[in-house]
Every structure is written in C-alpha cells, then in structure tokens.
C-alpha cells in the first residue's frame, strides 16, 4: 500500500487531554504549509474548541489518519476505522509506544519524507469475534487482543475451547487471552504468552493463571478459527481493553483473524526490535 498524491489528513487526539491543542495546531501548520488539508474528528475538536467532523466522514475524506496520544488512542482509531482500511500514523505525546512510535518533534521532517515517498506501511493482523447469545449475534474487531475472563474474583471460570471445529481444551482458571502478533507484547506477555513478530499471520491462545500448570500458550496459524463456550457460568468478553460484552452459559464466541488488517505508517528505518528493546529493557 502506498499514499499517492496526499491531499487530506484526519487527526484524532487522546480523549480528555485538552492540553494537546498546541500539538494539534502545530501539526495543522506543518501539514497545511505543504498543501495538505487538515481535519479533526468531532470529539477531539469539541475537546479543544475546534470544529470537527463525525469520525466516519473523517475517514471517508482523509488519505490517512494521525493519532496524537499513545497506543490506546491509535488502537481505538484503528478499530473504529477498520471498515475503511485507511492507514494510520501514531504520534506519541509522552513516552515511546509500541505502536505510536513517532515523536512529535520528528513530525515536520517525517511529513517531508511522506511527500517524498520515504516511508513504509506495515499491515498488521487483526482479530474478528462473532459473539452468539440468546439475544442474537454481534461482531467485533480487535487490534491487540480479545480476553475471556471471569466476571467475579471469587471463583474460577471454565472455558470449553474448540480449534477448527474440533475439541481442543477445557481451561480452568481466570480466563484466556487471544492475541494478535501486535498484541502479543500486551496482556498476552504478562500472562506468560510468547512475543510474536508483528508482521506474521498467526495468533496466540494463552491461559490466564490456569489451575493446571500443564496449560501452556499455543500459537495458531492464521487460517484457524477458535470457538469458546461457557458451559456453566457467565464470562466477560473484553475487546482491546476498551469494550466489554457479558456472555452466559452456553453462549459462544468464534474468533479468527479478520479479513482486513491495520495499516500502520512508519519511518522507513523503523525497527521493531529496537522498540522491543526500549520498551522491555532488553540488552541494557
């Protein structure tokens, strides 16, 4: 994927952070001084007293999106813009992020690189979950992970798991994390799951505090599908730590890699392993 003849960009700011107004105005100046029209989504605009556009309209009218904030801001923008398959550039307003890896001080020079074609767009896998309950069916997408966990801390949860239609395992514990390669360094890593290179087409199934020490993480190929049932209790389905659905006994969740993905804009010299070393403190 390439950005040809860039004319319009849409900006999303981290919520509840009105102090980002100065960054927005500076970003607007940088883009507009190079002939690129700038718009902002209406929630971000309302936060800083600037006229904005509804998010769907912003996606339709922009060549790419820019998030200013942190990884959470970028994850939200990627999920909300999924149907448009629009590239996203993440700028961190604070500490370096795994995803929002461009420092704001680098923006002006990077915009020149964008115009010159000196950049890269990485396609990252996403998850799609179909949740079937007594009340109907709903579908969600996730960029990092989908977590099934117990609604109460007082007892374990039992999750029956099927892989490609065949019985695989019954997990007893606090739940499971189903993670994309991008999300493998989030909850998955804390739960003892593996680090997956973000451009691979696989996903991980990792138990959370399992009752049996033989329950270990599993990496599955991208064409597989997982089905999870809660046979005798309710559970929470948490999507990227941002949305939550409660399911009850015998409801099902089907999870697979989504047909589309996320398209992240990076500097041409972006190196995932350098970010990994920085964030995890490796090699220091």
Predicted regions and their residues:
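Catalytic core of DAGKc-family lipid kinases
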Residues: 96-174
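Proline-centered loop/turn at the N-terminus of a beta-strand
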Residues: 37, 85-87
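Short glycine-rich anion-binding loops that position phosphate/pyrophosphate groups of nucleotides
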Residues: 71-73, 94-96, 182-184
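Short aromatic-centered micro-motifs
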Residues: 161, 183, 237
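ATP/NTP phosphate-donor binding region
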Residues: 1-64, 68, 105-120, 131-140
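Short glycine/serine/threonine-rich phosphate/pyrophosphate-binding segments
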Residues: 20, 72-77, 185-189
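Gly/Ser/Thr-rich active-site loops/lids in small-molecule metabolic enzymes
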Residues: 169-214
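ATP/nucleoside-binding phosphotransfer catalytic cores, i.e., glycine-rich phosphate-binding loops
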Residues: 148, 164-167, 215-284
